[in-house]
A protein has these predicted regions:
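Conserved Class I S-adenosyl-L-methionine
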Residues: 58-60, 178-271
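Helix-to-beta-strand junctions that scaffold the AdoMet/dcAdoMet cofactor pocket
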Residues: 123-124, 137-139
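A short SAM/SAH-binding and catalytic strip from SAM-dependent methyltransferases
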Residues: 113-126, 149
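Conserved class I S-adenosyl-L-methionine
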Residues: 2, 7-49, 60-64, 83-86, ...
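Conserved catalytic/acceptor-binding region of the Class I
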Residues: 127, 142-211
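A short acidic, Gly/Pro-enriched loop at the edge of an enzyme's catalytic core
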Residues: 106-114
């Protein structure tokens, strides 16, 4: 899904009603794509690679992944019909797409690169997840993952708080987002235990200049807030969004442009 909403996956990849909104998500395409290219720079290209892109979204960046690696085969996997509807335009020449939950992905040691940009934050229990993804790799396979880690910013904390307030808490059935993304040093330890002979793990702060503080609402509306939108009754969602806007904006500097620091974890390992 290349969708950096942040949260747990039981509720995510199997979420209730609404689908992703590609147009809303891609309003900040340049800013959201920058970490993809940083992650791709960590990958060691090899001839005839078989690549899997977990959470491929619209497929546009998957096409770039396939092209830059000159891969023999690249499979983009996503669970969003709306996102995958866009991907058909990029299929062909060894690149194809499948609708599937990330939890349903499994392979028997025949993948040269498992790549995931801004998707695994939707999946819980990262230690068993990384173990499963490692099992899909060939003997010299690589794992490359980027995940948002901005859950302690007011843009995220405000949404978490409002979800616990009436009338939204009852409408959400008491649902609370869990945060599965671990500290960078924990991922480094996991990669070591899983037998990766080389690794690179870092926390990076991306410096985004948005038009105004109001743009933060639109940014988060295309990612994190989608989880609440699809869980809430249609008549409550506008009220949630308005309360979020009224609560968040006073916490942010009224500046033009508005500086929005966004933390992300990037990890890469080679067996």
């Amino acid at each position: 899904m290349h969708a950096e909403g942040d949260g747990e996956k039981n509720a995510l990849t199997q979420s209730p009603s609404a689908d992703w909104n590609p147009a809303q998500y891609e309003r900040f395409r340049d800013e959201r794509s920058r970490p993809f290219f940083d992650l791709l720079d960590l990958v060691q290209p090899r001839p005839e690679m078989r690549v899997v892109d977990l959470g491929c979204g619209t497929g546009e960046l998957t096409r770039e992944l396939h092209r830059q690696l000159s891969a023999r085969e690249t499979i983009g996997i996503d669970n969003s019909p709306a996102m995958l509807a866009k991907s058909a335009a990029f299929a062909g020449g060894g690149l194809r797409f499948e609708q599937k939950d990330i939890d349903a992905f499994a392979s028997e040691g025949d993948v040269d690169l498992v790549f995931s940009n801004a998707a695994l934050q939707w999946v819980p229990d990262h230690e068993p997840l990384l173990r499963r993804l490692t099992a899909a790799l060939t003997q010299r396979g690589q794992l490359a993952v980027q995940m948002p880690a901005n859950n302690d910013h007011p843009s995220h904390l405000t949404a978490f708080a409002i979800a616990g307030e009436p009338p939204f808490r009852a409408a959400l059935g008491g649902y609370e987002r869990q945060w599965p993304v671990l500290a960078p040093e924990v991922y480094a330890t996991l990669l070591h235990r899983l037998g990766f002979r080389e690794q690179h793990v870092r926390l990076q702060v991306y410096a985004h200049e948005l038009e105004s503080r109001e743009a933060v609402v639109e940014w988060v509306r295309g990612s994190l807030l989608t989880d609440y939108e699809r869980r809430l009754p249609a008549e409550l969602w506008p009220h949630f969004l308005e309360r979020y806007r009224q609560r968040l904006l006073p916490q942010l500097e009224d500046a033009r442009p508005f500086f929005y620091p966004f933390k992300r974890v990037l990890l890469w390992g080679a067996r």
